[in-house]
């Protein structure tokens, strides 16, 4: 072998050995940078899990492998200790491996049965009995509505498990015909049951990840399929988290717009002022006024409202209403005359119907 070819072969061999030692690139699998936050990692997994689930890609022979790689990437990068080991030594540096069921990870985000991959929950078979659905109010802050978040819910879920013995199941009413003699029959109704394996209900701890999407609206529901009440002869019902946005001390939501009030002094209302309002995610909204600001005046800050739920690139407005704080102490006669001379404004007293048109 020529020296040049030998050198090329050695470099290729070293590259392949390095790739094997390094293992899979979990950041690339999830499509996130190495600086990604845990919220970014969860969001990426939730999105890709729906896209790559084998049930949604029956014609892709690599679908199962892709889904397993995705689960492995999430398992490692969502755990701070495993992520630290992975960042330092690669996949081979993980001490205890990562052998969690990727179906379990998927169910933490979507429930036991996942979704029918048309975007709608499973279709109910009328012949299969189902347990009751459970609706739980989930309180979220306006900060979470603005920026989004993942809320971890731990619950004890009753689950039907096989137990020793047999039991009667699928009981139903049937008609039995008995011949009493020539041309004489007796029809009786009786209960007929099948024999099924015995079951018992046990409580199992379940951890569910509820994604609070930016712009989520009050009353919206997030379903977790198969996480409701069990049914010993059929399927469990569903668990639905119903969003309840708690009141905020500074901002009020109206659609995608945010409303707030700012109190300024009488001097500021006359000569102008500058100030910053701290927004829901901590960034500052600057206000500068160099003109007279009347009590009740409103200022619109476009794009400083909440993100639209259907399109997060669109944001509402922040509407600021100004209140003027008048002096509490009585003015001296000298001060009154000074103000009159300064403003040079005569009386504009007028009585009118201020509610006309409402």
UniProtKB/Swiss-Prot annotation:
Expression tissues: Widely expressed.
Gene Ontology molecular function, alphabetical: misfolded protein binding; signaling receptor binding; unfolded protein binding
InterPro entries per UniProt: DnaJ-B11-like, DnaJ_C, DnaJ_domain, DnaJ_domain_CS, HSP40/DnaJ_pept-bd, J_dom_sf
GO biological process, one term: negative regulation of neurogenesis
Signal peptide: 1-22
Residues bearing PTM Phosphothreonine: 188
Entry coiled-coil feature ranges: none
Expression induction or repression: By endoplasmic reticulum stress-inducing agents such as thapsigargin and tunicamycin.
Record annotation: effect of changing residue 196 to S: Drastic loss of interaction with denatured substrates
Description of post-translational modifications: Contains high-mannose Endo H-sensitive carbohydrates. Cys-169, Cys-171, Cys-193 and Cys-196 form intramolecular disulfide bonds. The preferential partner for each Cys is not known.
Location(s) in or outside the cell: Endoplasmic reticulum lumen
Domain J: from-to ranges: 25-90
SUPFAM superfamilies in the record: Chaperone J-domain (SSF46565), HSP40/DnaJ peptide-binding domain (SSF49493)
Clinical condition linked: Polycystic kidney disease 6 with or without polycystic liver disease: A form of polycystic kidney disease, a disorder characterized by progressive formation and enlargement of cysts in both kidneys, typically leading to end-stage renal disease in adult life. Cysts also occur in other organs, particularly the liver. PKD6 inheritance is autosomal dominant.
Subunit structure: Part of a large chaperone multiprotein complex comprising DNAJB11, HSP90B1, HSPA5, HYOU, PDIA2, PDIA4, PDIA6, PPIB, SDF2L1, UGGT1 and very small amounts of ERP29, but not, or at very low levels, CALR nor CANX. Binds to denatured substrates in an ATP-independent manner. Interacts via the J domain with HSPA5 in an ATP-dependent manner.
UniProt-recorded name of the protein: DnaJ homolog subfamily B member 11
The species this protein was found in: Homo sapiens
Gene name of the record: DNAJB11
């Amino acid at each position: 072998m020529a020296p040049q070819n030998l050198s090329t072969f050695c470099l290729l061999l070293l590259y392949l050995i390095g790739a094997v030692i390094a293992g899979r690139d979990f950041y690339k699998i999830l499509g996130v940078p190495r600086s990604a936050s845990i919220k970014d990692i969860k969001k990426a997994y939730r999105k890709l899990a729906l896209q790559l689930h084998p049930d949604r890609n029956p014609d892709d022979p690599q679908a199962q492998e892709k889904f397993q790689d995705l689960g492995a990437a999430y398992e490692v990068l969502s755990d701070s200790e495993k992520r630290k080991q992975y960042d330092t030594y690669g996949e081979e540096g993980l001490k205890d491996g990562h052998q969690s069921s990727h179906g379990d990870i998927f169910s933490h985000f979507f429930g036991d049965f996942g979704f029918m991959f048309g975007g709608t929950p499973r279709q109910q078979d009328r012949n299969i009995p189902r347990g009751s659905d459970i609706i739980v109010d989930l309180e979220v802050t306006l900060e979470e509505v603005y920026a989004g978040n993942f809320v971890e819910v731990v619950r004890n879920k009753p689950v039907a498990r096989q137990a020793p013995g047999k039991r009667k199941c699928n009981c139903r009413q049937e008609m039995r015909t008995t011949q009493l003699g020539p041309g004489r029959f007796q029809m009786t109704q009786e209960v007929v049951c099948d024999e099924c394996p015995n079951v018992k209900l046990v409580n199992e701890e379940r951890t569910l990840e509820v994604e609070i999407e930016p712009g989520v609206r009050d009353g919206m529901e997030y379903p977790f399929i198969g996480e409701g009440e069990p049914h010993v002869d059929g399927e469990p019902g569903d668990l639905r988290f119903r969003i309840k946005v708690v009141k905020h001390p500074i901002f009020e939501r109206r659609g995608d717009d945010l409303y707030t009030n700012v109190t300024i002094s009488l001097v500021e209302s006359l000569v102008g002022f500058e100030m910053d309002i701290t927004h829901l995610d901590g960034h500052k909204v600057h206000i500068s006024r160099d003109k007279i600001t009347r009590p009740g005046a409103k200022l619109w800050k476009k794009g400083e409202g909440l993100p639209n739920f259907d399109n997060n690139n669109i944001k509402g407005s922040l509407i600021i209403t100004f209140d003027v704080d008048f002096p509490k102490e009585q003015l001296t006669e000298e001060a009154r005359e000074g103000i009159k001379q300064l403003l040079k404004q005569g009386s504009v007293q007028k009585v009118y119907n201020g509610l006309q048109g409402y």
